[in-house]
Amino acid sequence: MIKTEGQGLWELLKISLPFFVLSTCYAVLVLYLEEKFGDHIFLKSSQIGSVFGLAVAFFLGFRMNSAYDRWWEARKIFGQLTNNARSFSTKIYTYVLSPNKLVLVQEEEAKKAARDLIDLTCIYISQFKSEISDNLNAKKDEETERLFKDYSIDQNNKLSNEILISLATKIEALFAPKATIEKSDLMQHINQFYDIQGKAERIKNTPFLKIYSAFTKATVILYVLMIPFIIGDIDIGGEESYLEYLSIPLFALVSTLFLTINRLANLHGDPLAANKTSVPVDQICQRIIGNCQELKAKILS
């Protein structure tokens, strides 16, 4: 994830530099054609270019705004996941270690149940990350395999759902009938996990309208190809002043601007992809798991 302006500038340069080089080469080619065939290859009226450029700017503005909305929604979803997982683990630590709330009598049994619930929460977070990243064949350690066996988790089904079912079943069996408030509170967190997962899967499985993206890209490319014919050459001071060559960097800058904005919109429009502009899913999930493991360490101490 890009965290500083310096990193952002470096990534921006890596994206825009190829566009600038290609635009410069294209401008040189057009200027060469003008020198060979004359000024009649340029458009005599700039009105067409102005109207077309305004339309392209509107398209790109809407595209960038929509892409950022998707990115921000994804970031809020993972912020909600962080808060829900931390709160859920904290309440497990608090509720399960209250003997009068549980069916279990032995303190060691209660601690083991709390550890298992926190471990299952960590496994759920890891599995949720794997499913969002399409990494369905992630390796499982011995502790995970043990929990899957102890809680009869069917690995042939969707694992994230199976883990939540096991969590809900364990909570239902763990608390005494009089602990309805605690049980209901924890079940609400299970429901929130389902809600968060559904929102994330909606973003992942519903990409930004590809037809609109293709149309915007084609429009931008067409406009970029037209720009040198709209700008023309700059004949201030006469043909021998060489000021006409100012049209080359001018065209390259304008073209790079439009092409870079379109590229940034495409990157931000897929917020769960593995690139530097996407939501840092791995970092967020590792932080959540670390926080949950801290609570587990309190139980062991």
Residues of each region from the PLM?
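N-terminal juxtamembrane/topogenic regions of multi-pass membrane proteins
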Residues: 1-80, 98-102, 237-243, 259-267, ...
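Transmembrane alpha-helical segments and their cytosolic interface motifs
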Residues: 14-20, 189, 201-232
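Hydrophobic alpha-helical cores of multi-pass transmembrane domains in eukaryotic membrane proteins
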Residues: 25, 55, 193, 219-226
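Amphipathic, membrane-active segments
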Residues: 79-95
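Structured inter-helical modules in multipass membrane proteins
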Residues: 91, 95-212
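Selective transmembrane helix interface/packing segments
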Residues: 156-159, 214, 225-238, 243-252, ...
